[in-house]
Curated annotation (Swiss-Prot):
The record marks 156, 365, 382 as: Important for catalytic activity. The modification S-8alpha-FAD cysteine is found at residue 397. This is Amine oxidase [flavin-containing] B. It is an enzyme of class 1 (oxidoreductase).
């Protein structure tokens, strides 16, 4: 027996570490078992002379993400704003169009109506989905049986709206529109605060980063917990048949605990042997929920040359031939270590993984030169990347997605305890699931479930609302009267049709009254 404790936490990502910290603060004896040789999970900060520090995994925080902001502040971390001072670029059909604001402007009036209706409809549908129980939405079954591709084919009349919406899905959940359930995706966007909040840098999910990197959140909790965090300990068995739970690792250490928190992506539960076996619904759930595909790429330059052209570094790039769909400036706040971060998303991650690292860098630089209209993009000084698809202890990134039909059938067991095993991980969150924020919410909620089971807190304290961050306040997302009331393209056509019928009828009546109609 390697050790007795109150709680074993499986997984040393942000969710597991947040759970362990809360339990530790309550005076409980906690052991964290982490499969890798580092903590952080899907956050991963590297340090070297070329980059100083760099987040190769989850990195961004913003207003309304109050749990992660509070925890990070408690750990002594500070944030800085991602650069969005200059103009953004929308690159479509080989041309670059500078703009400001969260969404690229649309000049064609019919296309404008279509784009406006697209974002409005997604937000309206999201409002019907309960954040904590998407399967309870009035039209849950209908929406869950539909892919996002099918929904976009229904909503969008113009190719430009459909293309941008497809990029939006790829970017938000690193999956293709035909792979994900419409119900799940609409829930995902809703619980992040809607289409504008999730996509925005300023006043949105990508507003800030941590000085020194997001990996420090888990690292600093590890410093607090000391040797209670065990690295290179993949869990292979969890046995609940005795008085206490026995947790065995790959190197045959056995830990005995009163309770267990599983803080790993749901599908990685398949790497663990359970005794007694998992209940039917949990057993099937974990075989049905994959993670997205993404390669995070960072190209370094001598200086942030794009700023000289009044570009902030954000590029939204459409087209199958473009390896990267979305970029952000990744220069350090003092202006040093100039860099552009870009995502290779979904099927492109699978396709471009066949190339060498140098070949990928070359493709990125050529793309940036074209989009930014600058040969300086062809002279990188350094390049880093991380292919999350090859991580056996993540399974992909950013998060788990739900294919059609899964949320309504299996969603309700996501957070359901199995005996003395409780479930954390960003996937189980109800606000900013898929983000570091969701990881903290879920970890702390699972910890409080155990505290309640131990009689240390009342049931009504398991779920807690988080006060707004003083340092990173949220501005409300507003829409104009026109945006709320403009017709969709079909609505406009119906209006034109009705107007034509009404006009023809009125003319007929007038002609009849004046005796202009000749009877044959």
């Amino acid at each position: 027996m390697s050790g007795k404790c109150d709680v074993v936490v499986v997984g040393g990502g942000i969710s597991g570490m947040a759970a362990a910290k809360l339990l530790h603060d309550f005076g409980l004896n906690v052991v964290v078992l982490e499969a890798r040789d580092r903590v952080g999970g899907r956050t991963y900060t590297i340090r070297n002379q070329k980059v100083k520090y760099l987040d190769l995994g989850g990195s961004y925080v913003g207003p309304t993400q109050n749990c992660i902001l509070r925890l990070a502040k408690e750990l002594g971390l500070e944030t800085y704003k991602v650069n969005e001072v200059e103009r953004l670029i929308h690159h479509v059909k080989g041309k670059s169009y500078p703009f400001r604001g969260p969404f690229p402007p649309v000049w064609n009036p019919i296309a404008y109506l279509d784009h406006n209706n697209l974002w409005r409809t997604m937000d309206d549908m999201g409002r019907e989905i309960p954040s904590d129980a998407p399967w309870k939405a009035p039209l849950a079954e209908e929406w869950d049986h539909m892919t996002m591709k099918e929904l976009l084919d229904k909503i969008c009349w113009t190719e430009s709206a459909k293309q941008l919406a497809t990029l939006f899905v790829n970017l938000c959940v690193t999956a293709e529109t035909h792979e994900v359930s419409a119900l799940w995706f609409l829930w995902y966007v809703k619980q992040c605060g809607g289409t504008t909040r999730i996509i925005s840098t300023t006043n949105g999910g990508q507003e800030r980063k941590f000085v020194g990197g997001s990996g420090q959140v888990s690292e600093r909790i590890m410093d607090l917990l000391g040797d209670q965090v065990k690295l290179e300990r993949p869990v292979t068995h969890i046995d609940q048949t005795g008085e206490n739970v026995l947790v065995e690792t790959l190197n045959h250490e056995v830990y005995e605990a009163k309770y267990v928190i599983s803080a790993i992506p749901p599908t990685l539960g398949m790497k663990i042997h359970f005794n007694p076996p998992l209940p039917m619904m949990r057993n099937q759930l974990i075989t049905r929920v994959p993670l997205g595909s993404v390669i995070k790429c960072i190209v370094y330059y001598k200086e942030p040359f794009w700023r000289k052209k009044d570009y902030c570094g954000t590029m939204i790039i459409e087209g199958e031939e473009a390896p990267i769909a979305y970029t952000l400036d990744d220069t350090k706040p003092d202006g040093n270590y100039a860099a552009i971060m870009g995502f290779i998303l979904a099927h492109k991650a699978r396709k471009l993984a066949r190339l060498t690292k140098d070949e990928r860098m070359k493709k990125l630089c050529e793309l940036y030169a074209k989009v930014l209209g600058s040969q300086e993009a062809l002279q990188p000084v350094h390049y880093e990347e991380k292919n999350w698809c090859e991580e056996q202890y993540s399974g992909g990134c950013y998060t788990t997605y739900f294919p059609p039909g899964i949320m309504t059938q299996y969603g309700r067991v996501l957070r359901q305890p199995v005996g003395r095993i409780y479930f954390a991980g960003t996937e189980t969150a109800t606000h900013w699931s898929g983000y570091m924020e969701g990881a903290v919410e879920a970890g702390e909620r699972a910890a409080r479930e155990i505290l309640h089971a131990m009689g240390k807190i009342p049931e009504d304290e398991i779920w807690q609302s988080e006060p707004e961050s003083v340092d990173v306040p949220a501005q409300p997302i507003t829409t104009t009267f026109l945006e709320r009331h403009l017709p969709s393209v079909p609505g406009l056509l119906r209006l034109i049709g009705l107007t034509a019928i009404f006009s023809a009828t009125a003319l007929g009546v007038l002609a009849h009254k004046r005796g202009l109609l000749v009877r044959v």
